[in-house]
Amino acid sequence: MELIKPQQKVVSPEYLLFEAPRTKAFITGSEAASEAVKRANVDIAIAYPITPQSETMQRVGDLFGQGYIRDYYRAEDEVGAFSAISGASRTGVRCMTASSGPGLMRGIEVIASWPGHRVPLVFLIMCRVINAPLSIQPDNQELDYMISSGNIVFHAENHQDFFDWTLAGFIISEKCEVTLPVAVAVDGFFVTHARGWVEMPSSDLKLPMRDCYREAVPMIDNENPPIRIARDAPIQKSNFISYQMHASWQQEIHAAQERSRRWISKYLNGLVEVVNPGAEIMIVASGSAVSQSREALLQAEAMGHRIGLVKIKSLRPFPVEELREACKNAKRIIVPEFNCSGWLNREIRATLYNHSQAEITPGPRVFGGITMPTELILQWIFQDAEYCR
């Protein structure tokens, strides 16, 4: 029996994200991601299962069975999945994949090649601990690797972000002056397997198809070699021409990231969100640490203290000017993180060097799957373990 494909109306990205009526649903983060894919007019999805990503891609597979996606398959491993999705993107179709922790690390060689080949796609990351020892618990250490890979990287706080930013990722990735992969990360389990309220437009609406003839690198057809490196073979030689070509490609990726800022500002409503601007004590965080920081902020206000909060939405490109403006009056800055290396603290210190006199406190920092109680954040704010008891 022939599959009856669902009838969806193509609407503009602006209408879908900002104007269409929305209804609220109490769903998991995995469901939120798949609901975004349902409305994204995706041509192909390829992935290899790994906890906590597996449920999302299982649901995306269901969308294929229902006719919302044109093609879908499970790859033999992460290297195969990421290589195949790159090849699919080169043919001019809209693509997405996903992974977590060790799976991402296994395929990092391919992931780092995407930006240089200028392949637009969306990569969903459900963050988890990187082995060893083995753990499937939430921890976003893998983002330390992603922010140096050339990909555009968003770090979602909650279910609503995960839904909206996944849709926005397809739009931004395919802009002619961008033409880069967009990674949308969320902290595993805290969001993927927990339920939260998400406002969504009707599933009868979808994005326009990818316009592959309006991008920085042409798609594969009968007149274009199959991959960019085949057209630029001298880069494989050991001479000054190859050195210059490689350097220019790196500059090209950086420039494309910089050009993406205006689209991120438009579709994510800014690269940062600032609560209580001008406060002398500021919390700067991304991902699930933002949610915990919001609660700590409310508890501090109940005790008579005005604390500010900067939510970092985009890790690449990093909101340099926005962060400097938000922290210009700060005397102390707290950086809570769900990882052991403190990659966000490092970014903030580099950004504010010679632009702020604030004392930057590198923590609290939890990892390996442990939660971050608001009391812990308050202890770091007030530098007193007894203060918030």
Label for each model-derived stretch:
Residues 1-145, 150-151, 167, 187, ...:
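Thiamine diphosphate
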Residues 3, 181-273:
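Conformationally flexible catalytic loops at phosphate/diphosphate-handling active centers
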Residues 28-32, 258-281, 294, 298:
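Glycine-/acidic-rich phosphate or pyrophosphate-binding loops and their flanking alpha/beta elements
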Residues 134-136, 252-269, 284-292, 312-319:
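A general structural motif
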Residues 153-214, 332, 338, 375-389:
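Structural signature of the thiamine diphosphate
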Residues 293-326:
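Generic long, charged, amphipathic alpha-helical segments
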Residues 336-389:
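Peripheral docking tails and interdomain loops at the edges
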